[in-house]
Swiss-Prot record:
This is Multifunctional tryptophan biosynthesis protein. The keyword Hydrolase does not apply. L-glutamine binds at G53, P54, G55, Q85, S131, L132. PANTHER family: MULTIFUNCTIONAL TRYPTOPHAN BIOSYNTHESIS PROTEIN, MULTIFUNCTIONAL TRYPTOPHAN BIOSYNTHESIS PROTEIN-RELATED. Residues 512-765 are annotated as: N-(5'-phosphoribosyl)anthranilate isomerase. GO terms for biological process: L-tryptophan biosynthetic process.
Amino acid sequence: MATLLIDNYDSFTYNVYQYLCSQGADVVVYRNDKITVDEIVKLNPVNIVISPGPGHPSHDAGVSRDVISYFAGKLPILGICMGEQCIFEVFGGTVSYAGDILHGKTSTIKHDNRGLFKNVPQDNQVTRYHSLAGMPSTLPEVLEVTATTDDGVIMGVRHKKYTVEGVQFHPESILCEHGHTMISNFLSLRGGNWDENPAAGVLAQKVPAAATEKAAQEASPAISTPPTCSTILSRIYAQRVKDVQAAKEVPGQSQADLQKLLNLHIAPPLRDVVNRLKESSPALMAEVKRASPSKGNIDITVNAAEQALQYALAGASVISVLTEPKWFRGSLNDLRQVREACPLLPNRPCILRKTFLLDTYQILEARLYGADTVLLIVAMMSDEDLRELYQYSVSLGMEPLVEVNNAEEMARANAVGAKLIGVNNRGLHSFDVDMETTSRLAEMVPEGTILCALSGISTRADVETYVSQGVHGLLVGEALMRAWNLKEFVAELLGYKKKDPVPHTPVSRQVQVKICGISSVEAAVEAATAGADLVGLIFAEKSKRQVTVAKAREIVDALHKLPTRSSQLPVKSQKSIDWFDVQTEMVEQRVPWRPLVVGVFVNQSIEYMSQVAVEAGLDLIQLHGTESAEIARFLPVPVIKAFHMDASSFHAGQIPYVTQPGNNQLLLLDAKVPSLPMDRQGGLGQKFDWTIAQDIVNVKRPGCSKEQTFPVILAGGLDPSNISEAIQQVRPWAVDVSSGVETDGKKDLKKIRAFVEKAKSINLQ
């Protein structure tokens, strides 16, 4: 009589075969779809082994489940990995995600020293290749747990009456300790019941009444069923408790320290998440998600900030950032980077910190790292904790998203007064998805509360169903992360009407012209009447073109008295989303009326520049020295920041520094004269390297088309003789000239007019 090995199409099947043979078994192997129960009956095997295999035992195990059902109680059966899962399901249990995806990893197990584990030491190292496991909460009455990992994952089960055993690990692996002993223990079994195998020690043994407490303690350790065997949620909870405690113990990161940082205004400004969601219907809540307990790695290499920016540009109202490190591969740094990537958008989405919150410390962390809202999972906390965390979040200005999964949790969320409730279609105890969960709970949401559907959403049909039931917000993660064309997928998901493709028609434009170094009313008026858009007045102390505040006021007044050049502001056909595009458009909307006056300063105090701007009536300030661009935040008018580029030392790595948004509204590129100090740069006729300007003009920006160039003001060595070539080669937003329209150090009115006319004669597309 032979041992029958059912092959579930697994690469380890013949490792199992080898181990069985090494212990003296005569083994025959059949694949799970190449033999029937009737044929097995005719084989008359002495015992049966169900091999590991890919997939789920419900639909990928072939004849394995039928074999267990028929032969249990007739002969010994051993299930390995998927084989064990088949045993678990055949007798009424549920197999679902185990909380980790393990491939060739070892774990320490505790076991009951009986049956398969007789004479196997405790803390035995076993090898695991699985992502599924039997759910402890569904353990069938007829089975008992024989082994678990340190964190409670079931590693072995046994039928209480029949000689049926299963192990979730691979005893045939070379890394598994005492695998041969386990196989030998199985092969020693005879018959279909444990009472036929007293040597296995499975059935309860009668002990003398005089047994001492010490003897009882020395007995084989029992493997308990739930709650000792944990769900995924409880395992995550336990890990987060450790993580929070560790974070609090980092010097400078205590709760008191974080509160000090908040008081110092380290946290960025907030947006009201409820109002932001109301701006769109339905509102997309897009999730940055590298991995998950149920799916494993989704996109482990994704850059959180880049992904978030793509979500924002596709129309997301909220961006959810997973910051849990172990199961979701996220971090607080992801949250910070996402927040820093989005604030320069005209209508940025709100940022949600999505993690397993259990302490006010984590909410304070979220606020400091840039979140506008946080996730509170009702299933993870008592009513008292839920109320405390909810009220604390609201006290920081963040209305939390309160997550529920059933009617009892919905009632608890309503009781705390949640204004934003999300129904998670994924059960956190098993991580199984039930898309009807939101539908069942929708009617329990009070009027005025925003309802969101979380998890499992991937099609337009899903969205239509939920919207018809009153759902307003839709949290989508994996489907977005895997989308080939994100914008098209979002448009389809939200039901945006497809527009007929319109051929790209280049729009011609003229460059803006700035005449700098103006020191007389006559020159200013000539520049204005010639068509200049900006007039520069220099206040730098060491400049030969320096003007007084009184002279500047005189020039400004003269320009204000000129007739307006247009009675109609330009209308943009496309909404701008880039910081610099928005700023240049604001300037363009003002210059048709009259030229704007720019005050040029070199390393002068904020107080002085502000005073001059107010007294002289300046429209813009140009920082032409080594000032930090951050100074722009403290000045009363928009700022042009000049960057003096040394062609001999320029590197592409400097471009992100030059094009950094959020401070100066405009940027100017000028040549650097290495022999002169920084407070003497500019206005010298030194030609700027146009190839450097081209590199900056052609820099790619998120959300901008290939045709959109980066708006720069080109300066350095320009004059009427080369301005046409410069514009055609560089394609700048504006050009700046000073010495190039002078004769003998004074502004030449003819050159001014010639320069403006030539610059304006070129139409760029």
